[in-house]
């Protein structure tokens, strides 16, 4: 979340909504939001059941209001004396909604099929990743998500893609297979211990995690304080 916070600042995003699924890890996500002090415009919890999810996304994005705005505008122009009303109506009929959204970016704290369901619902409610930032957590192991053309660009600020691709190539050369999520965590853990040891002249490891430190690994940034 600290990396996402930095990304939001660097890109000049002003209004961010945060979508959290009602899952076992919901509390951890909210705890992370609070500790990172990331600037959030509004927080929403959602039910991952498909039918309920779509209804909730419709409400969050004011979809029905924006859809009604479009229908009302078409009716208004039809009944007007505008000499160019046929062309205007034709252009309006190519749209799905009319009216702005009250956010610049959406952070989706979800994974796998559930994440895809959320992005699909956003597209259905006429929220495009080409106009609003779609941001999510570490998803580099889900190649199928990267292949979803309709939801691009989607941002994963926690990992540098170029570094990750280089790591995969090196791992493949050494072990003749692609790395798993666990192997990547192990890779970062070794780097983390080495980094902290080098800062302490390799004298002791007993107090390495008691001092506040920050380490940028392949999986993202690790913030350590009081053995946590």
Put a short name on every predicted segment.
Residues 25-29, 52, 186-190:
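Extracytoplasmic ligand-binding site segments that recognize negatively charged/polar headgroups
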Residues 89-100, 104-112:
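Extracytoplasmic/secretory-pathway proteins
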Residues 2-48:
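An alpha-beta-alpha
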Residues 34-46, 53-86, 101-105, 117-187:
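Extracellular/periplasmic periplasmic-binding protein-like sensory domains
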Residues 176-190, 194-228:
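Segments of small-molecule ligand-sensing domains
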Residues 19, 107-109, 135:
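Structural motif
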Residues 23-26, 112-116:
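Short acidic, S/G/P-rich loop/turn micro-motifs used as interaction or catalytic elements
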Residues 1-2, 114:
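Beta-alpha junction/loop-to-helix N-cap segments that form part of ligand/metal-binding clefts
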């Amino acid at each position: 979340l600290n990396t996402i916070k930095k990304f939001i600042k660097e890109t000049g995003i002003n209004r961010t909504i945060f979508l959290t699924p009602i899952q076992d890890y919901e509390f951890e996500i909210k705890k992370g939001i609070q500790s990172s002090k990331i600037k959030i415009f509004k927080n929403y919890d959602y039910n991952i059941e498909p039918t309920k999810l779509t209804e909730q996304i419709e409400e969050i994005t004011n979809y029905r209001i924006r859809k009604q705005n479009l229908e009302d505008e078409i009716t208004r122009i039809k009944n007007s004396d505008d000499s160019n009303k046929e062309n205007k109506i034709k252009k309006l009929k190519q749209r799905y909604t009319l009216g702005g959204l009250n956010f610049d970016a959406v952070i989706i704290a979800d994974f796998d099929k559930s994440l895809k369901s959320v992005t699909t619902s956003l597209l259905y409610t006429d929220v495009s990743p080409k106009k609003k930032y779609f941001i999510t957590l570490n998803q580099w192991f889900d190649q199928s998500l990267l292949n979803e053309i309709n939801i691009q660009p989607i941002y994963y600020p926690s990992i540098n893609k170029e570094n990750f691709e280089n790591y995969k190539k090196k791992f493949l050369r050494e072990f003749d297979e692609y790395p798993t999520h666990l192997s990547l965590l192990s890779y970062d853990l070794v780097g983390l211990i080495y980094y902290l040891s080098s800062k302490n002249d390799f004298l002791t490891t007993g107090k390495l995690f008691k001092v506040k430190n920050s380490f940028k690994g392949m999986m993202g940034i690790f913030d350590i304080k009081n053995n946590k």
